[in-house]
């Protein structure tokens, strides 16, 4: 999973938004709203980490089973691809 260039994560009280930046402002309309877990995964993707490392970090950060962590990662990846801010 790789994030596309031209998007930024903005954290505000109660919400996390992925917004277009630079040239993307002209073509990408709207914003992608993420929950706190998805924002955590997005930040790890910004660091260039792969899904295996993200899974380990999820297990360290949250009290979830490995299966639940994997499910959350897969859902977030799908959301980011659907939203046009990432590619597989």
Q: What residue spans do the PLM features occupy?
A:
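Acidic, low-complexity/disordered tracts enriched in E/D and polar residues
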Residues: 1-46
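Long, charge-rich, low-complexity alpha-helical segments
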Residues: 30-88
């Amino acid at each position: 999973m790789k994030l596309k260039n031209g998007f930024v994560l903005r954290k505000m009280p109660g919400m996390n938004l992925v917004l277009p930046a630079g040239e993307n402002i002209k073509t990408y309309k709207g914003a992608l709203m993420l929950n706190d877990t998805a924002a955590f995964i997005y930040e790890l993707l910004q660091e260039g980490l792969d899904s295996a490392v993200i899974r380990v970090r999820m297990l360290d950060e949250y009290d979830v089973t490995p299966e639940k962590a994997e499910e959350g990662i897969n859902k977030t990846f799908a959301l980011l691809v659907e939203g046009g801010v990432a590619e597989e």
